[in-house]
UniProtKB/Swiss-Prot annotation:
Family of this protein: Belongs to the cation diffusion facilitator (CDF) transporter (TC 2.A.4) family.
Name by which UniProt lists this protein: Uncharacterized transporter sll1263
InterPro entries: Cation_efflux, Cation_efflux_CTD, Cation_efflux_CTD_sf, Cation_efflux_TMD_sf, CDF_Transporter
Signal peptide annotation: none
Record bears the keyword Membrane: yes
Keyword terms of this UniProt record: Cell membrane, Membrane, Transmembrane, Transmembrane helix, Transport
A single GO molecular function term of this UniProt record: ferrous iron transmembrane transporter activity
Membrane topology qualifier: Multi-pass membrane protein
Residue ranges with Basic and acidic residues bias: 285-297
A Gene Ontology BP annotation from the UniProt entry: intracellular zinc ion homeostasis
Domain of life the protein comes from: Bacteria
Amino acid sequence: MTARLARPYAVLSIGAALATMGLKLGAYAITGSVGLLSDALESTVNLASAIVAFWALSLAATPADSEHPFGHSKAEYFSSGLEGAFIFVAALGIGYSAVERLLSPRPLDQNALGIALAIAATALNGTVAWILWRAGKRLNSIALRADSQHLMTDVWTSVGVVVAVALIFVTGWEWLDPLIALGVGFNVLWTGTHLLRETISSLMDQSLPPAQLQAITSCFLPYEDQGVRFHLLQTRQAGSQSFISFHVLVPGHWTVQRGHDLCEAIETAIAERITGSRVTTHLEPLEDPKSWQHPDEFPPSAPLNRDKPN
């Protein structure tokens, strides 16, 4: 459901990428600045990334089936992973153009219209990035957040290029143009590295952030006075979905119905705090020593009450 709600924002990103790419190419054609050309090349990456994000969100919105019982929400990571690869390719192209211009410099055409077009493209990118960031946070979509972060990097890069071109017009220092283009290339490369690292961490089933782990354990506290204990908390993030599992240890004299009602109440409380979560519980008797023997258990990332009964 969340991925389906995010798709219109991916369409917005595609439209914005097409518009900004046209504006920046127009600015390059007027000024001849390789810095603006590098900025336009990065916009092609934005366009490709937006298209991939739309595809990934469409796939992530596909309901779970017999072959994919946990759903398709991890498809969002295809977007950030491929975006990182696109960014590396763009960085190489930017670096090549900058070195070529550094070795064979030529004067820029002084035209205020070119800079005005670049400023308009930057303003459009900034607005769309802000919209995508808010939507990504609200819908817990890593694809939208990654697209927003990339666009904001593009915004700051564009600001630097526009300022540099203006300075060149004032000072006449033509060598600033390729140097700034190289700086843009390194900035794009850093963005690609950051996105790839985030994607790899997510694909390795990284646990939920500490704040969310604390929200989960806070749901346990009201039941500890009843002699209930909890352990083996395991969490992972998969796109816009969070998967949470833990064991619930209750007194052995409890009925199955009472234990079931307790688990239902806890699962509901967690679902209200963690948007898009799927909670799985395992009920165990508190007095049975085997309930405490789990060789694969590791120290949890958040405090759990694991005290054995006296």
